């Protein structure tokens, strides 16, 4: 089957909203919305392999550290795992006083009862009710008319009141989502929400949340903004309602839809870090927050260590962040074009500490989010002839990890600037050897012994230290590398590890690459090459460790 010559026979444009006096186009966002992360619920349910409890707790702690104050933790009635996770958060004291747990439930009494039971003992909680309201869901999925769909919402809302009253020690906030809101007739969406409001009887002092999802993105962002402005004008008791947005990215405009929705009067935004979620993902909270930041608005979220946050998200979701992803991708602060590089160089030369940021091609100062300037201008001395990475792969079988490519290209650029000449493949390899493989001070690996004990690795290494001293370090861990890190006298965090074979047969060698941080410093890479893969990995660690310590010493001097 191929694309239709006349797609109007199969698809139709979404109807516009009659709102000739719309005001949102002339407004600007002046403050951060209330943020709600749905990573542990909407994000988790979209993963090929959902997170286990350990990963969920790690993710929860990261969200708290970043500063997210409302976190949708799970769907407690969906599984015992989700129920138990909520209990763990409450019973083990993982919910700070300024943070509110949110959970989701469908509109059935047994599920609602189970949901409230999961929250027993919580100081405060948001309980989130939803049912779909759009024509296609009414007709195709539920076989219900409008009254039937409205009754589902109203009856469930009454059950919320009933079960909340049984746990008066908790400060409850109720949230209702007319799922598929953006594909629902506005008058009917308002009718259902007004009916729920009537049951919950909110006040300006104790508000409810009405969450208005673009469950599937069906129109351009301006139409969604019109829907939000129309709804904000017409919903009952607006002063007692928090209007929340929940955008997906099916048309690639989830960020724009959310920003226009905030301009149209919304108070709150739900989403996921780096845009994980069903299909094309939920709106990306990181991009939303940093878009505000680069407009001079405090986003109320802290991404000072954006690479550390990305590491947690990638490991928990088991999904990579795209190298072109806004703000956090490996390549977003990198210029390959000569004219771009020239403009950036001139911008850095004129930029003064404390002045407004005006470096061309860089909408944010990379240092603000924990990035170094070294990756900004990546010079390829063999531009048009394959590049540094291509030459190393083709001539020497060395495949540098992406972030190390960025780091090493700066070393090459420094050498080409010094020589005033292009570098051959042999010269590039010699520079790699000198920079990484000969990084033997202050600690040089002499030998190592590895043993397996009760499923764990035990490592003892002999190290040549400064002043001809001999050191012996011992450590245990789940693998050889983890055991070595445990035995180091310095706090080291491994950010990334890669390995591959060089050549084949009896002459094959192993190459190992490590990215690590020493004592919370900036990430540094190391390389090790040896016939034995364990030895290669140890050499790579010492290479990175020595390079980091040398750089810290040089900076201190």
From Swiss-Prot:
What biological processes does GO assign it? L-leucine biosynthetic process
Functional note? Catalyzes the condensation of the acetyl group of acetyl-CoA with 3-methyl-2-oxobutanoate (2-ketoisovalerate) to form 3-carboxy-3-hydroxy-4-methylpentanoate (2-isopropylmalate).
> Which residue stretches belong to region Regulatory domain?
439-557
Which protein, by its recorded name, is this?
Answer: 2-isopropylmalate synthase
Q: Where does Mg(2+) bind?
A: 42, 246, 248, 282
Entry keyword Transferase: yes
Q: Which family does it belong to?
A: Belongs to the alpha-IPM synthase/homocitrate synthase family. LeuA type 2 subfamily.
Originating organism? Pseudomonas putida (strain GB-1)
Subunit-level organization: Homodimer.
